[in-house]
Amino acid sequence: MKQQVEVKELKEGKYVIIDDEACVIKSITKSKPGKHGAAKARVEAIGLFDGQKRSYIGSVANKVYVPIVERKSAQVISITGDIAQLMDMGDFSTFEIVIPDELKDRVKEGEEVSYITALGKVKLDIRT
């Protein structure tokens, strides 16, 4: 799910969709309006699911999409290799997710973990 907002309403630390990917905004720089045009904005962001750096340059009056990012909790039902089966604690639905290498030693069966969902993608969100 996503909603539309103007570029001038974006803030650092919030989310934006760039190249059909949900991204976390790292910096925003705005130029002043000139004699013949509107103010421009440069948005630097990092992909929420792939970690790639992306940027958007456009007028501050342009509209961009902002993803609706949800943080939820789930219980780890089973682990098979690098795939964990999780059960959402809110609606009790089950789904599978790939465990990143850096989190393999921290995810255990029976424990509760938090995850992020946006634009139909899911990612574990275990804070250090």
Swiss-Prot record:
SUPFAM superfamilies: Nucleic acid-binding proteins (SSF50249), Translation proteins SH3-like domain (SSF50104). Keywords: Cytoplasm, Hypusine, Initiation factor, Protein biosynthesis. It comes from the Archaea. One of its GO terms (biological process) is positive regulation of translational termination. The keyword Lipid metabolism does not apply. Pfam families: eIF-5a, IF5A-like_N. It is found in: Cytoplasm. Transmembrane segments: none annotated. InterPro entries: IF5A-like (IPR001884), IF5A-like_N (IPR048670), NA-bd_OB-fold (IPR012340), Rib_uL2_dom2 (IPR014722), Trans_elong_IF5A_hypusine_site (IPR019769), Transl_elong_IF5A_arc (IPR022847), Transl_elong_IF5A_C (IPR020189), Translation_prot_SH3-like_sf (IPR008991). The modification Hypusine is found at residue 35. Its main location: cytoplasm. One of its GO terms (cellular component) is cytoplasm. GO terms for molecular function: ribosome binding; RNA binding; translation elongation factor activity; translation initiation factor activity. Functions by promoting the formation of the first peptide bond. Belongs to the eIF-5A family. This is Translation initiation factor 5A. It comes from Methanosarcina mazei (strain ATCC BAA-159 / DSM 3647 / Goe1 / Go1 / JCM 11833 / OCM 88) (Methanosarcina frisia). The gene is eif5a.
